[in-house]
């Protein structure tokens, strides 16, 4: 017998009270079940969203979600990958007894995205082009790393200097001109360099709920660095139970790949009650040396490798020149979350992200030679680690200065190092960088009217950079201090923004925003190893950025979008203060006179669905980057060449070029074929030029 009957005397009065109570509970805890219309199986990860009320929910493994908060919503959008989008009112769902069957879709122009404003929005009402990669696509495509995951979009080019690499490029921009966001938290640090970076491999593709790539600037929401685009990663979330019984779900997989003898093991588990949810996800991966394809370039073949024998470096012939050794490495990823939802208004969660690789060799450096012998006996990236503690608080209300609020507090710790030793030289150089990144984001969404929404917020980010150098004699095992790669530095960013979305008419949407961002940098240099003409450098600057865009959507089969946006990137510690060998015979030195670079970007795109079978998408863009920071020849105390790492090297520095121009075209199509097959293709063309000091133009590097 239900315990509630034991608490109430059985009488007409108490029965009336009981009916009111059950009616109240049904009113305030209404569960929607979403199923596949063909096999009636429950659908998980279905997004339920109200465009007018900024209310959202996601179905659990049983295809269920509590939609009590949607009672006042006039339109409820329900979307799942591979299914037709449906719009209903709460009353319509009630008539269906809160059971909804979704039909497999053909093609759609509309989807729910987060990256444009950090809130769930309809992509058909956003003037920027956004590409989404779902967890189902990841499970089907099986990318080994998060860099490979981004390539699934067809819009991101990924450069790799070694197997343990992956440096994305979007619309001609790369490295620190792109912004990485994990669960709404900025991942970029003050030492994200202008050269190729591999920080994205710290993320686990198997723990992603969704990944979005926003093409073009979005500095209004994200601040500095968001010039070429934004990569927004949303990790797995705990699920809640809709009954008194705990909801327990999970999954596991193993994978083996022949090209690099990869062995991966992954497991995740979710345990949820009505108000509490827990999640744990772990992936262990080991990669052996990568085997090059039989039709690969001759320059990348490895006819020999270096081994240590009786205190000497020796050259050992490779039995298989296509084996790119050394290039193997291992990696561990783990994610743990605690989620507490006391009621429909408040939502609190804590997440611990952790990733660490083993040491891995930089393959292109091992291909270099000097006087007929290998240039290096060792050139490794040391273990790359990333840890993030993330606390988020969300609140929803129907009245007041906001409809929904999100507070994100995060502490990230990054460590990376470079270990190198010349061939048959006893001294091994080790340069280690540690960055502690503190951040606080407070974001709001407010429904001003049925046709207007306002998004606004503030951000504060502090990076504490600690850089150390050490030289070790591998014969005597004696270590001495060595030159560091960076100065000791603190980098501060603070900003405030506002963005308005207004439905001008049924077919026309306007979106416009404005942001102010301040940047401060304080660096102290060690001049005991290099004769720098300064010991301290400071930057204190600020920039206004904005955007104005229109979306014309005459119907669900066609849309046009146009957007103008500005963006900026302030010099970070890597731009201003690093000392490193950029290429054979060249050394980059600090330049304390750097200024921010500023971008103006124009974007025009269209998408069309033909006969519900063919989707065509075309976008063109043009970006002008003023004061672009690029590497150029430089002088140090009047000297154009200085000795570095035992070699006389040309002095270079990051400098503000006159202007850089980037333009391009992106096109793609998606064709639905019989029997569930699908054909897709993407085309990307981009060109970048920068003005030299003498007025001539040259191709841009990393732009």
Regions found by a protein language model. Give the residues of each.
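Outer-membrane beta-barrel signature, preferentially recognizing the C-terminal barrel domain
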Residues: 258, 376-398, 485-491, 535-553, ...
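Short, acidic, small-residue-rich periplasmic hinge/interaction motif at the N-terminus
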Residues: 35-39, 46-51, 79-83, 95-139, ...
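Short acidic/polar hinge/loop motifs at secondary-structure boundaries
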Residues: 187-217, 334
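Gram-negative outer-membrane beta-barrel transporters
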Residues: 505-506, 510, 519, 621-624, ...
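Signature of Gram-negative outer-membrane beta-barrel scaffolds
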Residues: 454-558, 570, 580-583, 694-695
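Flexible loop and strand-edge segments within Gram-negative outer membrane beta-barrel domains
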Residues: 325-331, 341-402, 413-435, 482-488, ...
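Transmembrane beta-barrel wall of Gram-negative outer-membrane proteins
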Residues: 260-287, 296-359, 385-387, 448-449, ...
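N-terminal periplasmic accessory domains that precede
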Residues: 96-101, 146-149, 166-169, 181, ...
